[in-house]
From Swiss-Prot:
GO terms for cellular component: cytosol. HAMAP family: Thz_kinase (MF_00228). It is an enzyme of class 2 (transferase). ATP binds at K116, T162. This is Hydroxyethylthiazole kinase. It comes from the Bacteria. Its EC number is 2.7.1.50. Pfam families: HK. Its cofactor is Mg(2+). GO terms for molecular function: ATP binding; hydroxyethylthiazole kinase activity; hydroxymethylpyrimidine kinase activity; magnesium ion binding; phosphomethylpyrimidine kinase activity.
């Protein structure tokens, strides 16, 4: 699985993003840092053409509005048409009725390879009661592994639930990642950037579970390494991007705290 970090850098896959305008710059930069090539678009007119040549697709509802629904649906359906792996990041799905309805329609009409969110977002999608505010989760203290696994079975895709312990599962096999730092919460967009990393790895392998795990692990481990010596938040963000850029098989092998459950 760790070899995927080399494959991304070697193949430089094209990852098209239909994402939010708060974190779009960071998502583009993190895609470059890991070795892929980002394309950011809000254009209806080019969806078919762009998705057909991309290697993977990101759909992120973070700054959704009434005009975005059709764009997201168009992009998702194009990804399915051209057999491109696509990740959904349902940012703040529990925060409003409009977000919940948008996400429900996307899940009903598009076959996603990965659905990625924090624990509260994923549990909400699965029909469970959640504790959260805005786009932030308060559900991280309890072990939600079995709940997330059942949601993955229901959605018939890989599900990523980030938190104190990150959970990645397709309903059959499950990875749990114990790397990371609370300081990742102090930067807007680390979740969005994680979706970009997942898409970068999905673009170079058919093993979606491993690709999603590598995306989450790269962010969590890079955050841990970036926080050595407890730098202030601005320095931490710079360190984070540098750590992602420098991530390699050796660093993954030496520092990953990961377990696999059947």
């Amino acid at each position: 699985m760790y070899n995927l970090i080399k494959d991304v850098k070697k193949l430089n896959p094209l990852v098209i993003h239909y994402t939010n305008n708060v974190t779009i710059n960071d998502c583009a930069n993190v895609t470059l840092a890991v070795g892929a090539s980002p394309l950011m678009s809000f254009s209806y007119e080019e969806v078919e053409e762009m998705v057909s040549v991309a290697n993977s697709v990101v759909i992120n509802i973070g700054t959704m509005n009434s005009n975005m629904l059709d764009l997201f649906l168009l992009a998702g359906k194009a990804a399915n048409k051209y057999n491109k792996p696509v990740v959904l990041d349902p940012v703040g799905v529990f925060a409003s009725k409009a977000r919940a309805e948008l996400t429900s329609r996307l899940l009903n009409e598009v076959k996603f390879s990965v659905v990625k969110g924090n624990v509260s977002e994923i549990k909400f999608i699965g029909g469970f009661n959640v504790r959260g505010k805005g786009v932030d989760s308060f559900d991280e203290e309890e072990d939600s592994t079995e709940i997330i696994r059942k949601i993955a079975e229901k959605l018939e895709c890989v599900v990523v639930a980030t938190g104190k312990i990150d959970i990645i599962t397709n309903g059959k096999g499950t990875y749990k990642i114990n790397n990371g730092t609370d300081k990742l919460k102090g930067i807007t967009g680390t979740g969005c950037m994680t979706a970009s990393l997942i898409a970068s790895f999905m673009a170079v392998t058919e093993n979606i579970l491993e690709a999603a795990t590598m995306g989450v692990l790269t962010m969590s481990l890079s955050g841990e390494l970036a926080n050595l010596n407890n730098p202030p938040i601005g320095t931490f963000k710079e360190n984070l991007m540098n750590a992602i850029y420098q991530m390699d098989i050796d660093a993954l092998s030496k520092n990953s705290n990961i377990e696999f459950l059947n």
